[in-house]
Amino acid sequence: MPNAIAQFAGANYLNLETFRKTGVGVRTPVWFAQDVSHSAPSITVFYLYSEAGAGKVKRIRNNPRVRVAPCNMRGDVLGAWVDGRARICQNDEAAYGQQLLTRKYSLLKILGDFFSRLMHHKQTVIAVEID
């Protein structure tokens, strides 16, 4: 699946499709950072973050199956869909995911974090594993 993963290089957004209990997909464009130092080279991990109470977080808790594709800011898909499994990160992994996202988006991420804290919004880091 190297070509499927290569399509994300240089992309700023990925379209995350999570699934309702009915099986209907819900697509959301999100910022992401790829973990290129992952210990298993056959696994690609994308980190993203969201407000803890967001629908996508609730859907991931109910069903970890997701699909991702590179997209633009509006969510227009720019490549092929890839299947994956998502999980809510805790502790050190959440901090690592935040660090990768801050490194990629720098000032925009820092400002977003500031306003999230100001509004008392709790953030959740999500890892998406692609085999």
Predicted regions and their residues:
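Extreme N-terminal tail/first-helix region
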Residues: 1-15, 111
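Short beta-strand segments
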Residues: 11-52, 66-70, 79-82
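Covalent nucleotidyltransferase core used to form phosphodiester bonds in nucleic acids
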Residues: 4-5, 45-50, 54-61
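Short, structured beta-strand-loop surface elements
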Residues: 53-131
